[in-house]
Amino acid sequence: MLQTDALTLARQIRTKEISPVAVVDAVLRRIEDLQRAVNAFITVTADEAREAARRAEAAVKAGERLGPFHGVPFSVKDLLFTKGVRTTMGSRIFADQVPVEDAVPVRRLREAGAILVGKTTTPEFGHKPLTDSPLFGVTRNPWDLSRTAGGSSGGAAAAVATGQGPLALGTDGGGSIRIPAACCGIVGLKPTPGRVPHIHQADPFSSTSYIGPMARSVAEASACFDVIAGFDPGDPYSRPEPVDDPRGVEVRGLRLGWLPRVGNRLVDACVLGSCEAAVRHLEGRGARVETVEEDFAPFEQTFLVFLQAGLAARVGPYMPTFGDKVARSLRESIERGARWSAADWANALAQRTTVYRRVRALFERFDFLLSPTLARPPLAVDHDPYEPITIGSESAGSIRGAWYPYLWPFNLSGHPAVSLPCGWSSDGLPIGLQIVGPWYGDRRVLALAGHLERERPCARPMPL
């Protein structure tokens, strides 16, 4: 049951082959069994989930109209509001915060019949690409407990990868869905701005953060996206669902831009080989592939201005009281953010526009862009995010510029991007491929990912 996908679970619940009570009980036992080793959850809503499962079972027996995910368990990253369930932002600052309303995609999943089993771990305020916090400890990669699950949606990815619920909601402010998806061997989508409404952001107009689905397969992620996407007036970028975002894609004739590097010098050989094999597979199916030389490295500072200045503005005021109760990496990010000037912020806004225009120009030549998700397999679980990373035996540079340089540029530009598994490293760790599409091409991105997943399956038995 734990390895059954969300769509099959929903069908089996509708046809009374299995009970939502049994499904939820199995997931809650799995969470309890793995919490000490993996540590994917901050809060487990066991009582509420069991009560919801009983109501779901009664609805099935009564012949009521059922939603597409009726009785299916899901989890939510602890940066997203959940009505009546504490939302800590991964920090002691908000350890007792209980929202009075759901985030829009949380509400939509509940309305679709899905059952919340808990809130997953995140570094404080999602400030780094590894998942640990003084509030809850360290979240580990289920494929190798000495490695990171990635971040900042690390708990969500680790939970999905190990059967602690087939669906999760994550957030992606600079790769925070795609990094852990690649680290844990699952699928994660960063949507176009506004496709999945994000109404509780402090500054939606300059945000780089997006809410997206995480699942073990593209089909599940796509079905989840169908539920959570759609207009909401609380998000200024939200709009009615586009009519020109088809659910299928014909590979023959596609124009694909392949970006093996984007200003980074080093790429792990296993990563490069696995991703190139996926690209060449598409070429063999009739796609036209061109290697693109694009350098996003000069825009790393632009990304840091948004990240660090935002933290300084929103979290900095709490430092006199909580400064000794938060992670050193968060304090350092806030201190750096406080040093950026208003002119730096204005320049960052202009540079963000430059990134958007450069990426948009690429889509005049290509239908999709493809790249590795990460330049190397998962880092050590205790890696210092302010220290350089190594690839092979060489020092490769900063964690953003050397490990995930392929990701944050599309947070700046807003283009939809999905990470899906495409291979395994020599030491048995997942490797992710990123597919990027034009604005509002989210379903086309998922369609191409689904094509690769069907034709080049690389799933392995569930870890742990």
Residue map of PLM features:
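A short helix-breaking turn/cap at a secondary-structure junction
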Residues: 190-273, 277, 455-464
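Glycine-rich, small-residue loops and helix-cap segments
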Residues: 16, 27, 71, 111, ...
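Acidic/His- and Gly-rich active-site-bordering loop/insert found
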Residues: 49, 59-135
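Short glycine/serine-rich loop segments
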Residues: 101-228, 411-423, 427-432
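Acyltransferase
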Residues: 20-25, 54, 269-293, 315-321, ...
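Residue-level signal for inorganic ion chemistry
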Residues: 27, 49, 221, 256, ...
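Short helix-loop capping/hinge segments that flank enzyme active sites or metal/cofactor-binding pockets
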Residues: 69-89, 248-260, 306-360, 373-377, ...
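An N-terminal boundary/leader segment
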Residues: 1-50, 284-286, 461-464
